[in-house]
Amino acid sequence: MTAWTLDRARHTYSVPYWSDGYFDIDGRGRLVARPHGDEGPAIALSDVVERARGMGHKLPLLVRFSDVLGHRLGKLQQAFAQAMRELDYRGGYTAVYPIKVNQHAGVAGELARVGAPVGEAPYTADFGLEAGSKPELMAVLALARPGSIVVCNGYKDREFIRLALMSRTLGLDTILVIEKPSEVGLIIEESRALGVAPVVGIRLRLASLGAGKWQNSGGDKAKFGLSPRQVLDAVDKLQAAGLGESVAMLHFHMGSQISNVRDIASGMREAVNYFVELSKRGCPIRLMDAGGGLGVDYEGTRSRSFCSINYGLDQYAYTLLQPLAEACAEHGLPQPRLITEAGRAMTAHHAVMVVNVSEVERAPEGRVGPAQPGEPAVIRHLREVQAELDVRPPVELFHEAQHHLAEGQTLFALGQLGVEQRAQLDDLFYAIAHAVRQRLSAEEKSHRPVLDELNERLVDKYFVNFSVFESIPDVWAIEQVFPIVPVERLDEEPTRRGVIADLTCDSDGRIDTYVESEALDASLPLHALKPGESYLLAIAMVGAYQETLGDIHNLFGDTDTVAVHLDGAGGYLLDTQRRGDTTDVMLDYVGYKLADLRARYRANVEAANLPEATSAEFLAALETGLTGYTYLSEEPLE
């Protein structure tokens, strides 16, 4: 057996493969963040949690490493600046952040603060913002840097359009993207009413689309965008209104988290044909917005799997720019500025959800007691299987044990076995299952199906103090994968395999797929709990979409949130970004009047005719419960 080392720990939890250099394991076996990548300072998650607790924060705790945002943005911009130099592409590039990915001020505001041009002219990579609704637009108008690009996507009414047009007079390069034909007339009318010339983008409904869980945002069945005929009609209508010069941008979206770079290349080639054709029709296209799609490798498998990608930033940039450069050269067209809306790639790595294990239910070990006179035949058959563990093929033995277990379960349901015999049935089966697993090998092809089944069945359940639906809703909604790593003890070999279940009263409140050793598995290597010690897990790469998609199932609310900022001297500062929701906040949200609740509590206590001291104690406990954190407390009751 290979000795446990830190490198084995890194490989077991696939840290080098999904983290892109932003996380590692230090010499003390602690998970550390590296906000500036491989070469930057390392911050132990356990230290952050300890300091946050000293500030009054509780688990579960969302930890933002704010410097990762700027670093990710810089890497994206540098990739495009390099591709522009290689292709001698002089149109420029803008990394636009679509704030729907994470609207929180600590994220969108931080990106807006650090977003600045990268590279030397004419190969400059800039930064802009995107809004897809009126509330998002109001945030963007306050965050955007003067002169920067603001892309307005989503369905629009007159107020949305008017606000966008007004922002142009305030010094922003705001583009109204036409998502449906009816918006053309509204833009014409509102621009005349305000006396402001619009800058218009047209969203193309491409036939090309990326495969995966997010593919419905592209292709012929897409919710947004114009068909070829609708594109031509929109251009004709704008030109007839004297606004032909306003058609400055083409926008398209092939899907989110595109795994295969070939899908990106196909979509870009199709969009470039639109660019050439509309330019020939007199549209002064100066911007090409390739939308989202740039994925991140949640799995660390570097593959075409839905939660992985088979390309890097440099290849992505080159794949988008090359067909555009070639088309401009072939047709003698001015090179447009390329825009992407790669919000997931900017934000996913920066946030980690730290959760504590509240309890572990060990997998049944099974036991073989002495045979009893008059045992049912089904139990005798299992004893016979158990006695032959060393002499018969393990797969054959397991299937036979399964048959007898199913037979016994049926007999119990019919009332022909007692509960003691039913328990004995399980004891024997699990003893056999553990012994069979010891004889199986992953190298033996015929063993793999049974080994996989046993690895799913013979696992511990780790009950964790958080809500899947609130903190990682895409696990439930689309079976997304997030890497999970113990915060400490990574210098110790994990001796258990476990699955994670949350606090909610819902069977979907669990995680079924785990990142392990550059692959996916149905369970995760974890450590046995030590008495008196907390066991913390880090759910990584939760910075994109999860916070605002989260719901309040079982009235579990937002968690405490802290932001880590490097201080430039090798240390870091820790800021409170948000105190988590308390019970009274959640009850108020669903319509309960807090004054009425308190009055009911008091009336019930008074009706119980308790001693005065006991009544006061009960009322104090009820008030504490009403105003406390919605998650489990680690603190003992006084």
Describe every region a protein language model picked out.
Residues 1-31:
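Charged, compositionally biased N-terminal leader segments and the immediate start
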Residues 4, 325-638:
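Charged (often Lys/Glu-rich) extended helix/loop segments that serve as interaction or gating elements
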Residues 20, 25-103:
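Low-complexity, highly charged intrinsically disordered N-terminal segments
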Residues 59, 63, 85-90, 281-285, ...:
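Flexible, glycine/charged-enriched surface loops at secondary-structure junctions
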Residues 75, 119, 315-322, 332, ...:
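Noncatalytic alpha-helical scaffold of FAD-dependent oxidoreductases
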Residues 88-289, 294-299, 310-318, 323, ...:
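Active-site-proximal beta-alpha core segment in soluble small-molecule metabolic enzymes
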